[in-house]
C-alpha cells in the first residue's frame, strides 16, 4: 500500500487523463486505490474535481466491484457536484475516525457505507420510536403481507430502537450486541424490488466499523409473504453465524418483523409524530429567535448556529405515556 501511495503522491495536479489511466491499470486494486484517493481528496482543495471523476470511473469500469461487495448497482453515488463528494468524504471520515483503508471496502463495511449514503441522499430522516409503541409493534403480526404492502414515505431512513425492547444482533468474535438503530432502504432495482435493512448494534469497544451489524434483503420474488422471507433470512444467518444457528428466539425474524411494522405504521393515516431537536436548547432558542427582531434576533441567530439543530421524528408519544 505504501508503494501505491507514493506512486499517487504527485497524482493530484490537473492530469485527469493520467488519473483515469492509473485506475484502469490498477482496477484489481480498486479498494486500495479508492482509499488513497479519498484520503488525498480531503487534503487538497483542488482534488474534488478529480476525485469525483475517479470515483465515477472506478465504478463505471469496475462495476463488478460494487456488485460483488454490496449486491446492488452502485451508480447512485456517482456524484455530479462537489457538495455530494464532500458529503461522502464527511460520512467516511467520521465513520472511520479519519482512517481510510481496505476495511472500508469489505462486504460488511460496504453495506454500512451504502445504507448511510442512501439515508443521507434521501434527506437523513430519523425516526425515534417511543418504547410503548415499540412494544406494540414488536407484538404485531405481519401475516398475509408481502413487500408490495410496504410503502414508506421515504426511499431511505433510519429508525432508533428503544433499548427497552431488548432487541439485539449477533456478530462473530464479540457475540450479542444491543440493537441501536435500523437503516431501511427501498431497493427498486431493474430486476427485482424490495427493501434492504441494516441492523446496527452498539459497539462494545467504541471502535468504528467493528462489524456490530447485520444486513438483510427482502425482495418481492413470487409474491412470498413477509414472514416467509424473514424466516429465509433467519435460515441464511444460521448458516453463516454461530449465534443465529443456536437462536431459539429467531432474532433475525423478530428484528425484521419489528422494522416492517415501523414501516407499516408510517403509512397509517393517523400516525402520531412529533419533530424534536436532538439538543433541547435548540427548540427553545428557535422559538425565541422567531419572536425576536432587530439586533436581538441577529444575536440569537448567531447563538443558534453554535447548537445542534438536527431533528428526529418521534413516533407514538402518547402510546408511551399510556404504557408507562
Where are these regions (language model features)?
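Intrinsically disordered, low-complexity regulatory segments
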Residues: 1-317
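C-terminal, beta-strand-rich globular interaction domains
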Residues: 320-324
Amino acid at each position: 500500500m505504501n508503494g501505491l501511495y507514493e506512486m499517487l503522491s504527485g497524482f493530484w495536479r490537473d492530469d485527469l487523463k493520467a488519473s483515469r489511466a492509473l485506475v484502469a491499470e490498477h482496477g484489481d486494486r480498486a479498494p486500495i486505490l479508492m482509499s488513497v484517493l479519498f484520503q488525498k481528496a480531503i487534503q487538497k482543495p483542488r482534488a474534488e474535481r478529480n476525485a469525483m471523476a475517479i470515483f465515477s470511473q472506478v465504478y463505471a469500469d469496475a462495476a463488478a466491484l460494487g456488485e460483488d461487495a454490496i449486491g446492488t448497482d452502485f451508480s447512485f453515488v456517482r456524484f455530479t457536484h462537489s457538495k455530494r463528494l464532500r458529503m461522502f468524504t464527511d460520512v467516511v471520515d467520521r465513520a472511520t475516525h479519519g482512517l481510510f483503508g481496505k476495511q472500508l471496502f469489505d462486504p460488511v463495511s460496504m453495506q454500512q457505507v451504502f445504507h448511510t449514503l442512501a439515508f443521507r441522499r434521501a434527506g437523513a430522516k430519523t425516526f425515534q420510536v417511543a418504547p410503548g409503541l415499540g412494544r406494540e409493534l414488536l407484538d404485531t403480526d405481519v401475516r398475509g403481507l408481502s413487500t408490495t404492502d410496504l410503502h414508506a414515505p421515504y426511499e431511505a431512513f433510519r429508525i432508533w430502537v428503544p433499548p427497552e425492547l431488548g432487541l439485539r444482533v449477533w456478530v462473530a468474535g464479540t457475540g450479542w450486541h444491543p440493537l441501536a438503530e435500523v437503516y431501511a432502504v427501498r431497493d427498486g432495482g431493474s430486476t427485482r424490488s424490495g427493501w434492504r435493512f441494516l441492523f446496527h448494534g452498539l459497539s462494545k469497544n467504541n471502535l468504528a466499523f467493528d462489524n456490530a451489524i447485520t444486513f438483510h434483503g427482502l425482495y418481492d420474488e413470487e409474491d412470498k409473504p413477509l414472514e416467509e422471507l424473514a424466516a429465509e433470512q433467519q435460515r441464511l444467518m444460521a448458516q453463516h453465524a454461530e449465534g443465529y444457528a443456536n437462536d431459539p428466539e429467531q432474532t433475525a425474524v423478530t428484528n425484521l418483523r419489528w422494522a416492517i411494522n415501523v414501516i407499516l405504521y408510517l403509512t397509517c393515516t393517523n400516525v402520531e409524530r412529533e419533530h424534536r431537536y436532538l439538543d433541547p436548547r435548540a427548540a427553545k432558542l428557535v422559538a425565541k429567535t422567531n419572536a425576536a427582531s432587530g439586533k436581538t434576533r441577529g444575536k440569537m441567530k448567531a447563538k443558534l448556529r453554535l447548537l445542534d439543530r438536527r431533528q428526529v421524528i418521534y413516533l407514538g408519544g402518547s402510546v408511551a405515556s399510556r404504557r408507562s
